[in-house]
């Protein structure tokens, strides 16, 4: 049986406040490790509601420095210190954020008893930024109004396993390899026609994609103007990537009911879901 590989949705709204959604944030749970992606305002409250322990977070990945993706970071890091965290925490974020982050760290976190290690990212190229025995995390260059990248979480292949059957001439029978699962977080970006093909080339096994879907077709001009994507465009990426499933998110506040977004995406790629706060999705 495959070990857990899950995505916890903490926030799936966009920049303007909404009664129904929180700003962007997710937790990726893989093989007992927990990684946060983006940290919009109020994220630490959502973590409490998710029942994921603060102490289990190893690293935080920031896709870009817009407030709805980063305004919750300092408050949460301060809470970690108040809780007595001593384990180091790794922050991966676009390089131009480092100067401001260090200023905020000096002002708000100077008395904390745990180390915070900042890893500056080059958002213009794909590169492996984290690796352990079972996992790699790679950047996905995106196209937004500020430097921005997504993140590709991918399992490493496991060693081949054998089934012992003493009734056969050759008692060790090789078992089929376990498919390598992957999760692609595609944050704020305009539609990139080559993105799906790139993901398909990197992910031969089951692939789940989260792709921003700020607008429906009725606001496609806004998507182009503000460098966002429509739900249909997100589905085009998933179809091109031959993905297993697509999670929509980053909904504009103008849509009180996101069913319109879902319907337009499913016209192109049927295994599409509306991500929702509090939901946990298997990869």
Locate predicted features.
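Metal-dependent phosphodiesterase/nuclease catalytic metal-binding core
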Residues: 27, 122-249, 257-270
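General small-molecule cofactor/ligand-binding pocket signal
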Residues: 8, 92, 117-122, 138-140, ...
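Active-site metal-binding motif and surrounding structural segment of the metallo-beta-lactamase
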Residues: 41-92, 120-122
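Short, surface-exposed connector motifs at secondary-structure boundaries
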Residues: 31, 57, 83-88, 240-247
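Active-site neighborhood of divalent metal-dependent phosphoester bond hydrolases
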Residues: 85-89, 95-122, 254
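Active-site neighborhood of phospho(di)ester-bond hydrolases with catalytic His/Asp-centered motifs
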Residues: 37-40, 57-65, 69, 94, ...
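Metal-dependent catalytic neighborhoods of phosphoester/phosphodiester hydrolases
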Residues: 73-80, 256-264
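Conserved beta-strand hairpin/beta-sheet module of binuclear metal-dependent hydrolase folds
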Residues: 2-50, 86, 151-153, 160, ...
